[in-house]
């Protein structure tokens, strides 16, 4: 594997199992994703939560769109897959028992505007959520804030969005996290979950 890829994957804080992969996406690709998301307004929906995919603005307020399975986003789907595969290879190299086999469950893009948020939550659970092994979030733009960070309560970690950065972390009860309420600017992310095949 490319040594440069391994060097770019760092653990945010020792023992946190929150990994950052800077420049996982090129600036031009991030800008293209944002532009194409904004031009697909008819496919946007209010952010959903839980296994029943319900709207609950007490927990999450954002504008989301699934891009996987759409012909006009196939190139973006492949770009995210390639980025994720490189990062997973680096994680596997560091942790012998993180062997898979794994796959993603498809990709979505999310926009958060001032006053919006994703309050404290975890990304695992029973039934169809039980296969989830990692959360993947790509930041598609720089967010000066205040607000917009990804914050982890048990690890005392707060990550500021930086264009092109990918973060990976476990979805379990150990990693309760939130998207801090954005007070200024607009935040764009792409997301997926890594699951067992």
What is each residue range found by the language model?
Residues 2-99:
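Non-heme Fe(II)/2-oxoglutarate
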Residues 71, 78-197:
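Catalytic core of non-heme Fe(II) oxygenases with the double-stranded beta-helix
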């Amino acid at each position: 594997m490319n040594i440069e890829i391994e060097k770019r994957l760092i653990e945010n804080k020792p023992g946190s199992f929150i990994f950052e992969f800077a420049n996982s996406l090129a600036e031009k690709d991030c800008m293209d994703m944002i532009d194409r998301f904004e031009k697909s307004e008819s496919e946007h929906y209010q952010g959903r939560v839980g296994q029943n995919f319900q709207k609950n603005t007490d927990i999450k307020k954002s504008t989301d769109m699934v891009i996987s399975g759409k012909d006009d986003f196939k190139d973006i789907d492949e770009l995210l897959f390639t980025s994720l595969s490189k990062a997973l290879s680096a994680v596997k190299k560091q942790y012998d028992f993180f062997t898979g086999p794994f796959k993603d469950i498809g990709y979505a893009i999310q926009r958060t505007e001032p006053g919006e948020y994703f309050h404290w939550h975890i990304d695992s659970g029973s039934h169809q959520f039980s296969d989830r092994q990692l959360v993947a979030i790509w930041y598609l733009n720089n967010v000066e804030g205040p607000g917009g960070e990804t914050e982890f309560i048990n690890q005392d970690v707060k990550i500021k969005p930086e264009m092109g950065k990918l973060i990976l972390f476990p979805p379990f009860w150990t990693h309760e996290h939130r998207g801090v309420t954005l007070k200024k600017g607009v935040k764009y992310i792409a997301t997926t979950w890594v699951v067992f095949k």
